[in-house]
Amino acid sequence: MAKLGVNIDHVATIRQARGGVEPDPVAAAALAELAGADGITIHLREDRRHIQDRDLKLLRQTVKTKLNLEMAATAEMVAIALSVKPDMCTLVPEKRQELTTEGGLDVRIAMQGIAEAVERLQNGGIAVSLFVDPDPDQVKASSKVGSDYIEIHTGAFADAKDWKSEQDELERIGNAIKLGAKLGLGINAGHGLNYTNIRKVAALGGIEEYNIGHSIISRAVLVGLDRAVRDMVDLIKYA
């Protein structure tokens, strides 16, 4: 059965809006795990707009399932990861002005730098995933640089405006899953997935873990984090 990694970045976003200490992402992570999450995902951005270094260190000490650190492939972030030792690092592109990650890594353009980051992290005992668009060239490049996993960027599917566009994106995702598996890559997926569209992606099969944040935290505001996580776990489990 596919697993659920809950991204708690937006718990930190709410905290940072007032510059205080609440809500606490560490407490949110514990509640998510108790509700059935198989892992906790955070993105330590270079501008520290939500998750802070202290959060990462505390989460490493408290997370009982799996800690997945999303990060840019920079020397600073690699050094932090090697110090803290999350279970997995997912390398993502980063732009200072974006509200959220807007697309996948262009692994083909930056193969040398990404390959070096992948090697350093793996030598430190950390599994590595690359966040890529469902593009066969990017999947192949991810394999060439030695990544353990890819996380397929599902944003274009989530943003599709009509049935035809949605089906086209599902086909792209399905093809990326098959190619990645053929190349020996583990397959994760995320971005824009919610309670309405998750089953369509889950029906494709072949995905080991979904990393979902915004929709779960949004629902948690209305029904509580425990129920929000349990509802998503059920959707994935019974897809």
Swiss-Prot record:
Pfam families: PdxJ (PF03740). The active site is at residues 43, 70, 191. It catalyses: 3-amino-2-oxopropyl phosphate + 1-deoxy-D-xylulose 5-phosphate = pyridoxine 5'-phosphate + phosphate + 2 H2O + H(+). Keywords: Cytoplasm, Pyridoxine biosynthesis, Transferase. It is an enzyme of class 2 (transferase). Its EC number is 2.6.99.2. PANTHER family: PYRIDOXINE 5'-PHOSPHATE SYNTHASE (PTHR30456:SF0). This is Pyridoxine 5'-phosphate synthase. It comes from Geobacter metallireducens (strain ATCC 53774 / DSM 7210 / GS-15). The gene is pdxJ.
